[in-house]
Amino acid sequence: MGRYFVEFAYDGTDYHGWQIQPNGNSVQEELQKALSMILRVEISVVGAGRTDTGVHARRMTAHFEIDRNIDCEQLAYKLNRLLPRDITVYSVYPVADDMHARFSATLRTYHYYIHTSKNPFLRKYSCEMHYDLDFNLMNEAASYLLTVKDFGSFCKAHSDVKTTLCDVSEAVWVRDGENAWHFRISANRFLRNMVRAVVGTLIEVGRHRLTLEQFREVVASGNRSSAGESMPGNALFLEDVKY
């Protein structure tokens, strides 16, 4: 069996996340259907992560196996002809049999976008915030995350994870324009709902509703209910996956 990686992007607006759902369309299902139709054999794909409903990916990776050689360039071309317009394949290429889209990934990067003034052209992919936010304080709080190992406070309740340990290597708010910012965070792995919960809690810091000391206490508590609200999914992008 030969193993192949597919690198692609998608607009998650009309999907119930990456993973196949019993009642709702998913990106995984669309990719599997297209591959199976083109290759004329039942194909299963494994993704680098599981984005939630409405979340987007600028660069996602998935792998599949097939027992014959394929023309990767031609397959990528055919996939782009067959897939919906909100999914784009960048490339298909062979990898070693032990390469795994999820478990071989060493770094994942997410961006969360916000804007602080009404803008009809940002509303679909950015969260509108009507607060006067202290981004310097938010970046002080964000930098503390680089010293944290247990992110249980930002894990969706009742998630079936074996560990809540993550190694965050970057967490910073970046200005994109006069009234636009994004939060960039990179780690070896992420918990379910983690990025949106982190952003929601940092917003509380930016509104001066949490002090830096209280933010550290929230992180240390391991209690999801003590952290901020989960932010909307439409402003979250999986930016990149490294191997």
Spell out what each predicted region is.
Residues 1-243:
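Structured-RNA-binding interfaces characteristic of tRNA pseudouridine synthases
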